[in-house]
UniProtKB/Swiss-Prot annotation:
This is Small ribosomal subunit protein mS27. GO terms for cellular component: cytoplasm; mitochondrial inner membrane; mitochondrial small ribosomal subunit; mitochondrion; nucleolus. It is found in: Cytoplasm; Mitochondrion. One of its GO terms (molecular function) is tRNA binding. Keywords: Coiled coil, Cytoplasm, Mitochondrion, Repeat, Ribonucleoprotein, Ribosomal protein, RNA-binding, rRNA-binding, Transit peptide, Translation regulation, tRNA-binding. Belongs to the mitochondrion-specific ribosomal protein mS27 family. Residues 1-36 form a transit peptide. It comes from the Eukaryota. Component of the mitochondrial small ribosomal subunit (mt-SSU). Mature mammalian 55S mitochondrial ribosomes consist of a small (28S) and a large (39S) subunit. The 28S small subunit contains a 12S ribosomal RNA (12S mt-rRNA) and 30 different proteins. The 39S large subunit contains a 16S rRNA (16S mt-rRNA), a copy of mitochondrial valine transfer RNA (mt-tRNA(Val)), which plays an integral structural role, and 52 different proteins. Interacts with NOA1. Interacts with MIEF1 upstream open reading frame protein. Interacts with METTL17. InterPro entries: mS27/PTCD2 (IPR034913), Pentatricopeptide_rpt (IPR002885), Ribosomal_mS27 (IPR019266), TPR-like_helical_dom_sf (IPR011990). Overexpressed in hepatocellular carcinoma tissues compared with adjacent non-tumoral liver tissues (at protein level). Ubiquitous. PPR repeats lie at residues 105-139, 140-175.
Amino acid sequence: MAASIVRRGMLLARQVVLPQLSPAGKRYLLSSAYVDSHKWEAREKEHYCLADLASLMDKTFERKLPVSSLTISRLIDNISSREEIDHAEYYLYKFRHSPNCWYLRNWTIHTWIRQCLKYDAQDKALYTLVNKVQYGIFPDNFTFNLLMDSFIKKENYKDALSVVFEVMMQEAFEVPSTQLLSLYVLFHCLAKKTDFSWEEERNFGASLLLPGLKQKNSVGFSSQLYGYALLGKVELQQGLRAVYHNMPLIWKPGYLDRALQVMEKVAASPEDIKLCREALDVLGAVLKALTSADGASEEQSQNDEDNQGSEKLVEQLDIEETEQSKLPQYLERFKALHSKLQALGKIESEGLLSLTTQLVKEKLSTCEAEDIATYEQNLQQWHLDLVQLIQREQQQREQAKQEYQAQKAAKASA
């Protein structure tokens, strides 16, 4: 019953107007300059036969020797077809489970995602990203954005959402462009889907909260509120551990209280910041559903206590007040704060997807310029690091050759 009330509340909250699509029927967020691959393609790279590199890696693994990061880098760099993507995936896995697994280079990860996009293998890119522990794929924000945008262009929001969840799990919301793209994907999915498992609610909640904390505007504060509401629901229904286990979230109880604190902060703010009615409706639906469910459970608990005697009741009186017992207070605070926000004109009626789309149009171009500049610096630094590795490899080979010749000469003289 409680779950159905929440779903109805969230469905009403999502009656928003979807943003207009491009004339071609597809949504384009990142500019052509951002996704352009010419600078990446024009970089200096070594040309090798993929079969020779694969054979070298196989022999090295068989001899139980470490494979160098240069070898796996060259293999990924020389992919030239969709079929070779599948072969390279195997060697990425093998390298991840080798002694040198910690030395998978950032440019190798970026190149892997680029190659997957180039040869229409986004599914492989996503698979290795989701299974990051097995493949070592921990991209930077620029690379995350490229993959996310590729799914948005195909209107594949399910996989775009999976990328957002991975950004959240890897705590990679430092860059504003990633925050904006992620929020756009999240609200696009929330506008269409009405039924969630508690795991999905937790993932949505965390993915809304973390970038929302970094956006100091109406979208950011509304995202915080929405995220706290979903996480608070999970906390009350599944327990606090379900919220923070294997998640980048704190293990301190009180997520619904934090949602109310967001309302208080916006109400007290002198800035022109509003909370979206959509997010407020979700929090209201969660509080009402949980409060009604709590009342029913209290009646059942009272019957159980009458049957079991007073000893258990005395023990319960010694237990610290729980979040469950605070629900009526939370609901009253919510109603009072909602009225205050309404009186102050701080409730935004426009939907979150529409607001986020406007924010993307306003801010993304500036964010792109910063990202592209950083990417170009990374390309230069990656090239310098690669040159150093190649020089070091040549020195080691020369040293090994000299040692071998010395040993051979010593044996001949003996």
